[in-house]
Amino acid sequence: MSGAIPFIGAFESTYQPAFDVDVLETTAHHLHWRTDLALLQTAGVSECRYPIRWHRIERDPGRFDWGRTDDVLGHLRDEGVTPIVDLVHHTSYPAWLEGFTDPRFGPALLRYVEAFAERYPWVEAYTLFNEPFTTFLLCGLEGIWPPHLQGLEGFVAVARNVLPALTGASRRCRELLPDARHYYVEVCEHATGESAAGLEYAAYANDRRFFVTDAFLGRELDRDRPFVADVVAAGGAELLELEPGHIDVLGVDYYAHNQWHWRAPGDGTTASPDPVPFAQVMREYWERYELPLIVGETNIRGACSDRATWLKYTLEQCERARAAGLPVEGYCWFPFIDSCDWDSILCRSEASVDPVGVYWLDEELLRRPSSMSDAYSLAAGGAPASALPAYELQPPVSRWLEGWLPQMEHWDWQPPPPDEVLAAIDDDYEIELKVVTRGV
């Protein structure tokens, strides 16, 4: 493949069932979507991962209100922006469903997907379900999101109800939208270890990361694989015999906190002090699935200049992967504007701005430019990573990314813009956010 890697826009939209609010609302994108999309186009972007808000469209079972969706998708179509529609983003299901173990979920998902496809037959690209593996972990294994199950039995309970629904919806989409491409978007992880126990658990984590995608594709799963054996023991044998779903493009979502270093089970560090290059992690996914790739998501939480530096790193890695023969078809910084409330992993709803966007949000939620938006526009316009600035990292990002610095040593570094230098902050802030429950 040759030429610049196309950029893909995106907007965070996760619905918080406990608060009946989504991130499009807390960031005011639902009010300013025309302005936000105009900023995206001005940057030179003509593709966008765009959320379809099932939780607002089907407030009552079987009754669909497509009015707002008609407006936005019609606008994108008129403006020549190709939407990669995001049909379910994490817990973005209607409030009348009682989470991912509700037996109504599968039929409801199929009904919704059919209704969408019949209304918008011109859509060229879609994601059925954003990051299923991560969602199953947060909802079923760790108990952070509803239905708040814990342990491998909880993970299996969620997967048993959702994965067959997804494979069925995938097959139905191929019938209704035969010319559209399914962008299957999943977290992109890599684990390393030290000591015998740490190395053993890293191998377990590196096996676990592929399980959901393998099962979705109906691959023959070796019951001797450590995680597969645990899934079977937890009651998930039927997940090994799913009728396959279909993937056209694999979106790999890469964050620094996706690289863990384990000393023993339950004793790990992220971001890893010894991370492998992102291009190498992409190759692991390419060699396993042999599908066209996009970076489905990436960002770093920090100063605007730090985000610009992470953009340079991840884009450079994509260029290296492509030069080595990997079919990297797109790059998505996620999201285009700052998000909200991820400082509690959406366990609170306080409109707490999360500094991760191309454009940052001020106290009045106005969209503000910065060194990041400048660098993004350069890259989206076709500039290679070598033409992007490398800003000296600020705390806490400078601590998080210490392990990545050897991969960046060939850069010419410069100080961050004076107006983007952060005031003194608590450098103990961790990259992997801790859950903060209400009232604590």
Segments predicted by a language model, with ranges:
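Active-site mouth loops of central-metabolism enzymes
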Residues: A18-L31, P103
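Surface-exposed substrate-engagement region within the catalytic domains
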Residues: L311
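N-terminal regions that are enriched for targeting/export leaders
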Residues: G3-A18, L24, A38, E47-C48
